UniProtKB/Swiss-Prot annotation:
Partially overlaps ASI1. It is found in: Membrane. This is Putative uncharacterized membrane protein YMR119W-A. Its main location: membrane. It comes from Saccharomyces cerevisiae (strain ATCC 204508 / S288c).
Length: 124
């Protein structure tokens, strides 16, 4: 199961890296390195968080199935609740990494745009 999660994440990263080559950033030339750093953080740190949470989620599902097979079904509701809780945690972690990186890119773009406008005023 862990190998399957690794393959899915690697396929996702490869597709994302290919699509990132086609994206052009609009704005001052100074923004490009910072935007690349923010994208790097989103891709690798966000995917690492998603991987860790995904592996924990799959491990919990496997543990729950083992417990259900070995024990009676009376604690099935508790196990089901744990599965949904960890699934929600995985979704929240992925969404949080996505939002933080894109908010950082927007803020960096705006800061450098304002700085360029300020420099333009100084020259005039």
């Amino acid at each position: 199961m862990r190998l399957l999660v690794q393959k899915v994440i690697l396929i996702y990263l490869a597709r994302y890296a290919k699509s990132m080559k086609e994206i052009q950033y609009y704005g001052p030339a100074d923004v490009l390195p910072f935007a690349r750093i923010a994208e790097f953080l989103w891709v690798y740190v966000g995917s690492a968080l998603a991987y860790v949470v995904g592996v924990k989620f799959m491990g919990t599902v496997r543990f729950i199935l083992f417990q259900i097979v070995n024990n009676s079904l009376r604690t099935f509701a508790w196990y089901l609740k744990e599965v949904f809780r960890l699934g929600a945690l995985a979704l929240i972690t992925i969404a949080r990494a996505f939002c933080v990186a894109h908010i950082n890119i927007i803020i960096i773009n705006q800061v450098f745009f304002l700085w360029e406008m300020f420099e333009l005023k100084l020259y005039l």
